[in-house]
Amino acid sequence: MNRYSIACATLFSLGYTLSPLSHAQEIANPDQWSPSRAAKISPVTQDQLNTADKNTTNFLLTNGNYAQTRFYPAKQINRDNVKKLHVAWIFQTQVKESLETSPIIVDGVMYVTTSFSHVYAIDAKTGEQLWHYSHKMGPITTYCCGPNNRGVQVLGDKVYLATLDSKLVALNAKTGEVVWTTDIADPELGYSETMAPTVVKDKVLIGTNGGEYGIRGFVRAYDAQTGKQVWNFDTIPENTVGVWATKDATGRDMHRDIQAEKDQLAKIGDPYKKLGGGVWQNPAVDLATNRIYFVVGNPSPDLDGSLRPGDNLYTDSLVSLDLDTGKYVCHFQYISHDVWDLDAVSPAVLVNVKDKSGKTIPGVIHAGKTGHIYVHDRKDCSLIRFSEAMVPQENMWTLPTKEGARMLPGANGGVEWSPIATDPGQDLAYAINLHQPMHYRVDSSPYPNGKLWLGGAFTAIPGEKQSGNITAVNYDTGKIKWQVKTPEPMIGGILATAGGLVFAGEGNGKFAAYNSSNGKELWSFHAGAGVNAPPSSYMVGGKQYIVVGAGGNTQVNFRRGNNIIAFTLE
């Protein structure tokens, strides 16, 4: 069994439980901190966040802007000169573990996070540490897929962090000191946080992990000044039955026994209180309509559908809410009654798209674990089209068995939590893909009160080749424009720039720049550890930088490290 097979078998058969040392809040290296340094740290206004898509200096949100396009509008680094890119500085964190942070840059100050909910403020020009916050965690936390953290967001003079033990923390942006802390949910019931908060209109938006633990998922808004809850939306409504759909979003039969499910529903009732539906990634925000768009993860237990009859709303769905109230507006379910963990985890992206008649309309796109990019009408969440498959598909939708059924894609996808990027000038979406053949085995078990609850296991198949892709898809046609094969599965994220480039990293440590129009590799660097984090870009001192974390990944077991690496031109 290769290292990826071992990782999948371990993580998804046994879960992921660590007992990290208890950490206390600190400002590390206080000799480096001074009032004069703090004075250089700028507040962030709502107007700046609203226009982040046009900002060629900063990188203000985890996916670049509220639309989550991951398109950076500066082009000082471009196809002609990217070969001259070199390391500007390397910052080493104190945590050598899975690194998924998306660096945030505000007027020359960078904020990054690490596993176990550490936050660092760094001088974006020199790589010098300004301050370090280490969250005080309880002695035992149970969570899926690694102790990751994907970043922070800044509004005003506060830095907002969601922690592994399910707390929301506001820090002083100049010092790293805690302003307030709010409990989101009980981690001993399986709730945890790895996503970056989204802050908009004085609200902090956050979802929750825990779909493998029998939670009831949600998205919530908290007051950015006080930490008090403003509204709550349960991603699992009290009636989760739905329409008894028999086909997936692409029209393929899912082999459901509807009568057996209805009989089971009559016996056990609706299991909405422990049906899962975590939200792994940030919502996109449409400022024009005051709506948010996010995707919802798998039902609990993952593989045993007999304990959860019905469509299991709103799992495996795109959902839109009113930003001010949290009220439901619309949804679209990709897979009803999912028993394969091929859920929706990569963040939704807002772009203008062509509808079925060829008219340009506001759209929302999502890259699924199924290997398709789905294109929706933003108004009502309806599906316009889906792309060609970016990865091999085989035996879809074969039901899991006690012996184990082979199906592609494996449970990681497709496209995992990795955010995609878009280039609006080319109508292209860029996604990184995984190809991991797996066996799906069902094994019924009762709800274990906050412990891992898969209802079976999905394990990589020994001896079968695993690989990845970087794929460019025209979202107005659904056609793949180009694809680059990689020797290992891809997880982490991607960045597109106005310089005609896309940047992406691999688990073997390679970080590369590609021509965004044809996929030709133009530059690469070996980081020594897995580059499994979304890159960011920024300008400081008149120079454009590309920055990325190189710390490996727990979920796919890539080599660990602790480096934040910034690159610039000679």
Residue ranges and their predicted role:
Residues C8-P20:
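Bacterial N-terminal signal peptides
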Residues Q25-P73, P237, G251-R252:
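N-terminal pre-domain segments of enzymes
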Residues F59-N63, S98-H118, Y143-K167, S192-R216, ...:
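Repeat-blade elements of multi-bladed beta-propeller folds
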Residues Q68-A185, A496-T497:
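N-terminal cofactor/phosphate-binding cores enriched in small/glycine residues
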Residues A88, E128-H132, E177-T181, V230-N232, ...:
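A structural motif specific to WD40 beta-propellers
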Residues F91-S102, H132-Q153, T181-A196, D234-N282, ...:
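Extracytoplasmic beta-rich repeat domains
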Residues L171, G217-K228, D311-G326, D380-C381, ...:
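Beta-propeller blade signature
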Residues V296, K359, L434-H435, P462-K520:
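Loop/turn-rich, solvent-exposed surfaces of beta-rich toroidal or solenoidal domains
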